[in-house]
Amino acid sequence: MHRYRSHTCAALRKTDVGSTVRISGWVHRVRDHGGVLFIDLRDHYGITQVVADPDSPAFKMAETVRGEWVIRIDGLVKARTEDTVNKAMATGEIELYAQEIEVLSAAKELPLPVFGEPDYPEDVRLKYRFLDLRRETLHKNIVKRTQVISAMRREMGNVGFTEYTTPILTASSPEGARDFLVPSRIHPGTFYALPQAPQQYKQLLMVAGFDRYFQIAPCFRDEDPRADRLPGEFYQLDLEMSFVTQEDVWDTMGPLMTSVFEEFAEGKPVTKEWPRIPYDEAIRKYGSDKPDLRNPIVMEAVTEHFAGSGFKVFAGMIASNPKVQIWAIPAKTGGSRAFCDRMNAWAQSQGQPGLGYIFWRSENDKLEGAGPLAKNIGEERTDAIRTQLGLGDGDACFFVAGEPEKFYKFAGEARTKAGEELNLVDRDRFELCWIVDFPFFEWSEEDKKVDFAHNPFSMPQGGLDALQNQDPLTIKAFQYDAVCNGFEIASGSIRNQSPETMVAAFEKVGLSQQDVEDRFGGLYRAFQYGAPPHGGAAFGIDRIVMLLVGAKNLREISVFPMNQQAQDLLMGAPSPATPTQLRELSIRPIPPVKKD
């Protein structure tokens, strides 16, 4: 018999009754029922119930074991009585009658519980992550993450992609976040950077004649902590294709990702045909470029119904500024004054002056609008709004006014709030879509200049002609995001493979041709030696797994994450370098300047 086990803790079945076996694992819990000891022994695969009664030769040793001790047990497999069968366990029809117990490793008093799923301070969980990972839910999440990545690799291979690896030590590149820098010992005073993404390398692979590249790519960004992103590093399914349009990318990756989602969705419906929603339409209908399509609320402009109306606030805004619009947020089943007042109070808590509303109710067999706005604009306009939005008895509508570029985010938040409060969101499904036709440029208030809105390596729609003849802020990009349930899960584009167009695009944001050659020299040179049209995307693995397992944050699906202060509490990183290390790198630390 093997030194440690003949079976795992999930393997034994009724067909093994009468066999003498050996299992090893962690003591999940010990129970004493009338002098008979029951030990649940756990390993990576599952749990087996072990029994030791006073007649067992292993009883005395069984009395000494404690939770999370690692032990080996030899015993006889017995069938459970019918009334003790546990159908919730794979091994629930049998139990192991202990004949010999060997303690392989005792455990100190635990700093956090492993049995069960009690809330515990996150810093304690991260410091003792090796214990935290023994918890059932977190352990399953990590296994599921590995399975999802394996499925992605399999599906990518099935549609002709090949996995290539790209360098981890590379040059610094302005891609929207700070780089993690690595000092060079051989070249004092110079630094490598950890890649924010393999963007330039995957494009260079296309120029080099490869096609359909992918990799499970680690990405590193020195960003301030955010609730929806892991500090330090994250992983993405990175891909690139040659001789493709954006439709080719969508037609390839949409069905592929639907297949991956369906494999792990546990029966929840998954979008098969992903809608393609232009960015401007997404902002207008949902107030967001990552809309949660499980929420049925669709906003509409109702400006005409308030122009010249008796509601002087909105009417005055419309008359004095042609950019002003009134957006309606229809809320089916929200037609009570109590709910409308709650929404208004919520808006004020968000720093807004309030949230105008109308709700409809039947009185004396007549459907009437109620609320201050209805009184001010009159029955005819109120009914026109109701008809436009398809509302009826027991429904409500909220209104946001101003210049859309200034209020659309709040309007989107109000849509989300109303959908959640009214339980309109179906949480047992995965709604996926493409958001397309992103703006290529945006105005930076901070720098008072035009800047790239997203990926600077995207191809502008209209190409060089658009850059030379259009207002930059009207130019769209061949750029797209994939969105699931209100989360961005991918971003991609058709790339700008023309040196002339590349230089013209960067000139719009204040960079010269020399700047382009200095910062993106490898890519710029490559494009002058025959570059195919190419495009791709990157899918965020961490976020996809988080959605699939229903985790509340990204740390619940990552093996050894940092905390929100970008610290690895288990390994003690970051940590000071030794004087010897600093001398070898020709580096002298400078204390940070204290801010007043």
From Swiss-Prot:
Q: Cross-referenced PANTHER family, in alphabetical order?
A: ASPARTATE--TRNA LIGASE, MITOCHONDRIAL (PTHR22594:SF5), ASPARTYL/LYSYL-TRNA SYNTHETASE (PTHR22594)
Identify the enzyme class.
ligase
Question: What is the name listed in the Swiss-Prot or TrEMBL entry for this protein?
Answer: Aspartate--tRNA(Asp/Asn) ligase
Q: What does this protein do?
A: Aspartyl-tRNA synthetase with relaxed tRNA specificity since it is able to aspartylate not only its cognate tRNA(Asp) but also tRNA(Asn). Reaction proceeds in two steps: L-aspartate is first activated by ATP to form Asp-AMP and then transferred to the acceptor end of tRNA(Asp/Asn).
- State the species of origin: Rhizobium leguminosarum bv. trifolii (strain WSM2304)
Gene for this protein? aspS
Q: Which InterPro entries match?
A: Aa-tRNA-synt_II, aa-tRNA-synth_II, aa-tRNA-synth_II/BPL/LPL, Asp-tRNA-ligase_1, Asp-tRNA-ligase_1_N, Asp/Asn-tRNA-synth_IIb, AspRS_core, GAD-like_sf
The record's family statement is: Belongs to the class-II aminoacyl-tRNA synthetase family. Type 1 subfamily.
Binding-site positions, L-aspartate: E175, R221, H454, R495
What is this enzyme's EC? 6.1.1.23
Molecular function GO labels: aspartate-tRNA ligase activity; aspartate-tRNA(Asn) ligase activity; ATP binding; nucleic acid binding
List the PROSITE patterns. AA_TRNA_LIGASE_II (PS50862)
Q: Does the keyword Cell inner membrane apply?
A: no
Describe the protein's quaternary organization and the partners it interacts with: Homodimer.
Which Gene Ontology biological process is one annotated for this entry? aspartyl-tRNA aminoacylation
